[in-house]
Amino acid sequence: MTFKGFSKKDFKTMQIPGLDARMAGIQNDIQPKFKAVGEELTTYLSAKLGDEMFLHIARHQRRSVNPPESTWLAICHDKRGYKKHPHFQVGLFDNYLFIWLAFIYENEESTKIANRFLKEKKLLAELPDTFAISPDHTEEKTYPVHGGQLDATLKRFRDVKKGEFLVGKIYLPDDNHLSPGKDFIKEAEMVLDELIPLYKAALQ
């Protein structure tokens, strides 16, 4: 499909009651956009990183009762799976779109990564003021990257078994960057450029 951007309808899809109905909306309306966006950004990241990257689209297969509160695509260097590795995400809650560099609780190097970011503060200090962080990919709550929560979030990621660290940028449903499609792709590439140094540091 030709990607025309994200619309307010996409956010409303994440409010549809019921597992089956919401999953139908995600599969019919959102996932085709994820595939189109993801293929472009995967190609972009592969070229930028000099390493083949692979697209994964969340299937929510473990869901049996409650509908997913968010949905996403992930881009990772591992073709078989992304959750245990640093990876990039683009996804939606019902009230914002996110572009994250994500380290979720399955990550096997959380101690090393958190300690590196805590020690080498310049890596995160240089991020734009418009960026945000999150301690949990399943929760909507985010904090400004320079808002005073950074160290606590990194320490939780390091010390708590289910701790996570996500950093990037969020967009409200009426943000002009979400459409047309070419504008969103350009914006996403700019965000990824800011996150690539962190990604590389995490893999060292």
From Swiss-Prot:
InterPro entries the UniProt entry points to: UPF0637, UPF0637_domain_sf
Cysteines engaged in disulfide bonds, as pairs: none
Highest taxon in the source lineage: Bacteria
Gene3D superfamilies referenced in this protein's UniProt entry, alphabetically: Protein of unknown function DUF1054
Family of the protein in this entry: Belongs to the UPF0637 family.
Name of the protein: UPF0637 protein lin1053
